[in-house]
């Protein structure tokens, strides 16, 4: 659950409402500074009208109240991460993982149903190779000379699985080639435990884990469904799909000459299953290197009789992690990658989640872990948390609680105060925009701008002992509420003290 600080749907205020559309445009043009004098009256009227609802949210709000409140709620299946269960998650998976979890949180908050799913690729040759890699490594550790295949899995996680397999099956499992698939299945389950732990450590909890192997019973009826579309044909002993008719560079093989399904066949079955479950929209988050795969899958969805526009692919570009300006050291645990657990250990959950949605997904992301340790305005997480902590500090100095100032009139604020209130009240508009445009970086951008506006106002205005103390404290409570709400939707915790 997201906890306190979430505005109920009925009490969310957005700057796109008719009463304040013109004022919002002018405020945006002035960089969220004080409203121009010609807009002062309109801004004051808007904030006065909505201040009671917004301020009540400070002390009376929870996540469940926000559900089923969208004007046109969508039923969405969000599939993300879906890494092969052959090793721990690495930095290439982190960006999509953080984006997906944040997207699901925002969608649920806005009133949509966003179900999350991880597709386990457990039917391919890579699972058998995992078993072979473990068997060979176990024999090597026992002093045998072994010959590894050209491609195999290595790293400390392999060594960690070996004693677990030995305890379950005995040493003979590593020498009996007829049991390599049994070893592989065991290892796959152990790797999934590692993946689930890493995700939990990052605050990410997938609702459903869909096994490729479990869907194999749907292969034959799905292929028959495709054949009825007239878009399948046989050539060279293989069964092909005419994906080139819908934008793919060539037709694709679905069933090999030995009757084994291709990877594409498994994906077609899976996506037919998704739409049969009644989802209006299916969203997949993929690495940018899968861009060429989109056309063939959309073609298959179309041939299955679904509107292919209901399948949406969001691509995530690569991440380059630095330390002291140099490429971050690879992990021994995975052999040749920077692990998700490495990133968590280096910068912590909050910093990781913030940074990994701080840029558009289609833009490459590069950052230095040392910059996130700085305690100044160059570190956005510190700067935003400092704003939230300052609010708590000034309430303590005034000897008051947020609930004590809810009755204060925002109409007593000057133009600068109204400008800050207007900025804080813009959160819901930002959330809708970020969700609908898929540009989640708009949320950290909003927080950075709000924190800058707050610190400027804080430094230029006396609060405790001033004529309009309660109105200013109520304004600060609203800013803190917006920060807490946004942080909760990003999977972060706002600091009370710093």
Sequence positions of predicted segments:
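Short, ligand-facing micro-motifs at secondary-structure edges
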Residues: 8
